[in-house]
């Protein structure tokens, strides 16, 4: 079962501080970014109510919502100068980086470049694969042997079938003389996509806690001593 993405009820007020924000960025813009993240969290959690009845368009929708969170969190951190962020450490940064690469690969192959995704070789998308369709498990799909199945997760692409896969990318190799000669299925899991989004939200919550503990006078004094 996929857990709902944590929301902003866990924020402690650090992101409400005006003084840490870059001088050339308004606090209103930061609030707009936070609002975008909040609405997207709600949208992703709403989809969970019928996650077992999703369609092809729902797959695209979920991938794009997670990508919106990724982009919005990036924009949020860009609201703060380097001297504010340099001492912030996110414990799950390594896992988040793996999740980011995974999400970018999924988004590229499904939404952005289904005919020529070539920048995600660790996930099998090296420019030789074409994404023909998004499919769900059926009796017809099970007819294909294990050699026709692969799956992807945070660690990359793997041979074989993963029972945790929720949907499949139906694709074939452009290197084949006969277009369907090298047809295969790549399994993907909703839980991995939701995990990426949740890691980003958790980073925001941790950053909020970091900002709450940050005192303006102490920060200015420390930076003056460094200079």
Name each model-derived stretch.
Residues 1-39, 88-227:
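Acidic, Ser/Thr/Gly/Pro-rich intrinsically disordered interaction regions
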Residues 19-83:
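Short, contiguous, well-structured surface segments enriched in hydrophobic/aromatic residues
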């Amino acid at each position: 079962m996929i857990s709902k993405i944590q929301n902003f009820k866990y924020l402690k007020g650090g992101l409400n501080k005006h003084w840490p924000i870059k001088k050339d960025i308004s606090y209103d813009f930061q609030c707009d970014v936070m609002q975008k993240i909040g609405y997207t969290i709600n949208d992703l959690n709403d989809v969970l109510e019928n996650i077992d009845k999703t369609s092809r368009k729902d797959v695209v929708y979920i991938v794009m919502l997670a990508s919106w969170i990724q982009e919005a969190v990036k924009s949020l951190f860009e609201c703060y100068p380097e001297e504010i962020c340099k001492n912030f450490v996110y414990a799950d940064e390594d896992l988040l980086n793996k999740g980011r690469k995974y999400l970018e690969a999924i988004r590229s192959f499904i939404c952005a470049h289904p005919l020529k995704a070539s920048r995600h070789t660790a996930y099998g998308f090296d420019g030789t694969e074409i994404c023909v369709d998004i499919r769900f498990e059926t009796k017809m799909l099970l007819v294909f042997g294990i050699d026709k199945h692969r799956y992807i997760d945070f660690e990359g692409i793997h041979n074989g079938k993963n029972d945790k896969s929720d949907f499949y990318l139906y694709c074939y190799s452009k290197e084949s003389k006969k277009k369907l000669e090298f047809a295969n299925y790549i399994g993907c899991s909703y839980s991995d996509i939701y995990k990426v989004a949740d890691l980003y939200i958790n980073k925001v919550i941790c950053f909020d806690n970091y900002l709450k503990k940050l005192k303006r006078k102490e920060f200015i004094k420390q930076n003056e001593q460094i200079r």
